[in-house]
């Protein structure tokens, strides 16, 4: 029997579908806030806010997670890297508004992303209360490594020929697909919730208007990068059959029709959720 894998996106087409039913049939890879509702076998995130949210939630102590530029630094360097010339009085006054972190405990390593503390404090001092209200847009995010630690940097993945690292700057969904191909080498990959487009004039995401996500009133995210990145993956792995799962395949909207840019790839096909149910007797 062909080795199957399920790659879960966060498009609204999967709303109401029980992902747990897939578990007996293959590994489940997901991205970003999927963990809030369902624990995949592996999770990938590429944006600072959601990466640190995932780590602070303890997910990396349960399953492998892959993050962008996830560089672990010895704990002894923390104070000097954080303060970087800022005086103690200023740090104490503003740090609580700026720093997002988990508990340090006895951690021996940490990962830090975000703005420069000195720069943020200078900005607050210059613009006063108005700027202090907006410091959430300029924060420092720190994750202290906890054991067991199953977090990895996407950069450390095997690069393709001509590439220096395993991170191509892709979005989270296609990045999770690449991680899955390297780690599992499936013969069939089912793309569930990778809607790419929207059913209407608003953003299509299960987690819209929640922390680290765009407001529900915003317009759709342009699909051009997702389409190009998945297309690259199809080209790199011609012996794997990719199946995009839609609610229907009747052309009622952009979500439920073939992707024109993928028409030259022979290893991508389309199916609906009822076909998926029948195929795996879900």
Predicted features, each with a name:
Residues 1-282:
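Metal-ion/cofactor- or nucleotide/acyl-coenzyme-handling active-site neighborhoods
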């Amino acid at each position: 029997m062909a080795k199957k894998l399920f790659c879960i996106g966060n498009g609204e087409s999967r709303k109401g579908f029980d992902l747990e039913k897939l578990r007996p049939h293959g590994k489940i890879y997901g991205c970003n806030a999927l963990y809030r509702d369902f624990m995949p076998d592996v999770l990938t995130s590429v944006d600072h806010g959601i990466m640190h949210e995932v780590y602070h939630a303890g997910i990396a102590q349960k399953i492998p997670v892959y993050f962008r530029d996830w560089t672990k630094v010895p704990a002894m360097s923390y104070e000097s890297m954080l303060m970087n010339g800022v005086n103690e009085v200023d740090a104490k006054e503003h740090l609580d508004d700026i720093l997002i972190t988990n508990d340090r405990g006895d951690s021996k390593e940490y990962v830090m992303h975000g703005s420069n503390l000195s720069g943020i404090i200078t900005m607050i001092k210059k613009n006063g209360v108005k700027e202090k209200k907006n410091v959430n847009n300029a924060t420092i995010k720190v994750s202290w490594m906890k054991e067991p630690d199953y977090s990895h940097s996407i950069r450390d993945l095997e690069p393709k020929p001509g590439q220096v690292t395993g991170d191509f700057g892709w979005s989270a969904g296609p990045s999770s697909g690449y991680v899955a191909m390297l780690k599992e080498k499936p013969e069939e990959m089912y793309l569930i919730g990778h809607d790419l487009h929207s059913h209407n004039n608003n953003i299509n995401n299960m987690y819209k208007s929640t922390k680290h996500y765009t407001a529900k009133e915003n317009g759709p995210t342009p699909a051009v990068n997702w389409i190009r990145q998945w297309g690259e993956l199809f080209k790199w792995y011609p012996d794997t059959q990719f199946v995009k799962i839609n609610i229907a395949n009747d052309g009622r909207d952009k979500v439920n029709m073939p992707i024109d840019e993928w028409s030259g790839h022979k290893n991508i096909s389309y199916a609906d959720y009822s076909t998926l149910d029948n195929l795996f007797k879900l």
